[in-house]
């Protein structure tokens, strides 16, 4: 399926995405997951990633292009986030361990001590800052809409053109909340991950989804 990327021009100023690395807040629990031995904890830098958010992080079958083994798996993780994680681990003098984790499980994994950091497109909201600390952002991106090429909304040029469209975004992201700013649309339930949204777009279950530009370009290039 061909996909088309449409800029949400009217939202650019207020909806800039910040990608951050984050560590557990000093006020949060320091308890470690039982399976993580103390020796391993001190010698490794365990980073949580979805491994499904290209071009920032993805899953592949080999170690080409600098990919890193995924903990407990025969697969590997690659992407910009992985490269940043490698640099941080190197600076700490520790071995990098990538822990593949669903988006909704990243914060619990960090606060429980299962991982040492999250390196992902996670905005530093006030609620999140109550339990975890954020680094300075290392990337900013505009939000865009991904629609089906040749579909009903292929010629949309502004957010007003999406009246009646069935739209969604990823669960527990501010991408989903911005749909409320688009008048007259049908806000579908949020989805767990981007592969699911791409399939939903292919099948006609949705007319578009909100994402950041690099992910949208990746989706467009893959089809």
Model-identified regions with their sequence ranges:
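Short loop->beta-strand "edge-of-pocket" segments that line small-molecule binding or catalytic clefts
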Residues: 46-49, 66-75, 158-173, 187
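Extracytoplasmic small-molecule ligand-binding "clamshell" domains
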Residues: 38-122
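Acidic, polar ligand-binding/catalytic clefts
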Residues: 90, 95-161
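Ligand-binding cleft/hinge of the Venus flytrap
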Residues: 60-72, 85-94, 172-192, 220-222
């Amino acid at each position: 399926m061909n996909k088309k990327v449409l800029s949400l021009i009217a939202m650019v100023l207020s909806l800039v995405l910040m990608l951050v690395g984050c560590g557990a807040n000093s006020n949060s629990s320091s308890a470690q997951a039982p399976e993580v031995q103390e020796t391993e904890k001190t010698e490794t830098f365990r980073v949580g990633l979805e491994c499904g958010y290209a071009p920032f992080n993805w899953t592949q079958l080999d170690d080409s292009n600098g990919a890193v083994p995924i903990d407990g798996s025969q697969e590997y993780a690659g992407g910009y986030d992985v490269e940043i994680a490698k640099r941080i681990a190197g600076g700490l003098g520790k071995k990098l361990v990538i822990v593949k984790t669903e988006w909704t499980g990243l914060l619990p994994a960090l606060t429980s001590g299962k991982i040492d950091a999250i390196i992902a497109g996670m905005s530093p909201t006030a609620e999140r800052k109550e339990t975890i600390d954020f680094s300075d952002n290392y990337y900013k991106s505009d939000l865009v809409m991904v629609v089906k090429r040749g579909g009903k909304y292929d010629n949309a040029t502004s957010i007003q053109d999406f009246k009646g469209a069935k739209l969604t975004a990823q669960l527990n992201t501010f991408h989903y909340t911005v749909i409320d700013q688009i008048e007259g649309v049908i806000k579908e339930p949020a989805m767990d991950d981007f592969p699911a949204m791409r399939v939903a777009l292919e099948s006609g279950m949705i007319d578009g989804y909100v994402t950041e530009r690099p992910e949208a370009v990746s989706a467009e290039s893959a089809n």
